[in-house]
Amino acid sequence: MMPQHHLPADIERTSMKIITGELAQRGLDIPPENAPVVKRAIHTTADFDYAQTLHFTPGAVAAGIAAMHAGATIITDTNMALAGITKPGLAKLGGQALCFMADPAVAAAAKQAGTTRAVAAMQKAAAEYPGAVLAVGNAPTALLTIAEKIENGLRPALVIGVPVGFVNVVESKERLFAVCESHGVPAIVAMGRKGGSNVAAAICNALIYSAAEMLDPTARGWK
């Protein structure tokens, strides 16, 4: 009979042990500094492909943790990603999370320019929060906008590029990662088609938990 796990902290700890064991069984060796992010993505999706598809520029995780320590502003491209980010942990660090997709000014700017709200939202983010953590889980056009802004001098604290889909997704991720590498901007990118708002939020949470020393669920008040 399988053991029953009812308490959230127990469930999460057991899940992480299973993930660690399966990574070892599959011969997947994750650099220790990247492990919290990779394991959190797998925990969220039950998809071990992220152990191989998540790509990191040098020091990206350390840069993300440092940004959280400094009270980062996280800007997402969807309200779903925004909803998934742990607000208590972020608030403890003095940070905030924002999404501009529902901003009337963004909608008006997108309509006037004949572009998407995702593009207009990232343009607003670049103008108002140039040192933010940018977390994209849905719109490849947002990644292309960020890449262009970086080429023109934008220096976000970290870019998380994990949109999901079939059209322009792979190409936008590859372009963003190449631009971030060449310009020294920290980036975490899920290569290929997979990703999503839940993955973007999970990566943010891994960084927040690490910064707040809340990797163990009991440190987050879970029983």
Give, region by region, the residue ranges found by the protein language model:
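Short glycine/serine/threonine-rich phosphate/pyrophosphate-binding segments
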Residues: 81-84, 140-146, 166-170, 196-200
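Active-site cofactor/substrate anionic-group-binding motifs, chiefly glycine-
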Residues: 51-105
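Buried hydrophobic positions in well-ordered alpha/beta secondary-structure cores of metabolic enzymes
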Residues: 77, 159-161, 203
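C-terminal functional extensions of proteins
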Residues: 167-223
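N-terminal nucleotide/polyanion-binding subdomain common to many enzyme families
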Residues: 2-70
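Long, charge-dense
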Residues: 90-129
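Feature captures the catalytic cores and cofactor-binding loops of soluble hydro-lyases/lyases
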Residues: 128, 142-159, 163, 168-171, ...
